[in-house]
Amino acid sequence: MRKEENTIEIRNQKKENKMNYDKKIEELNLILPKAADPVGAYVAVRISGNLLFISGQISMNENGELIKGKLGKEFNTDDGYNAAKRCALSIVAQAKKACGNNLSKIKSCIKLTGFVNSTDDFTDQPKVINGASDLISSIFGDAGMHARAAVSTNSLPLGVAVEVDA
């Protein structure tokens, strides 16, 4: 049995997906951010066979400013949901860049892992990470339905509220 990890599956070059994901993004009035360069000793994406692994994308607003803070203290569940949604937009931007700006190469999203910077008594991590899951499935439809983990942590890089990888 092959071990699946957080990843997005990409299509063989010869097979094209009939769904126009760029059109869907436009219909949803979404704007993809610029795919960010890594801030450490790692790569933003790695392709292995037909699998695309995307490093953690941190919460940033429309202006590229970090969404910093702790759920259960500075932010509520709805704020976290929106921060996770922003992380997912960055995941899609990274996937698009890795696929030569051709999202039709995406076959499916296999798994997301979301990390929520939260207080000890905050327990809505799954609701927060729904922001990322809902965005991915709204763009990719059934191909965007994925396995998932939503993890609480007491700190995230640069003090951000949410981080999601694929």
Descriptions of predicted regions:
Residues 3-18:
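Short, Lys/Arg-enriched N-terminal segments with co-localized hydrophobic residues
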Residues 19-166:
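Short, polar/acidic, helix-capping and beta-turn segments at strand->helix junctions
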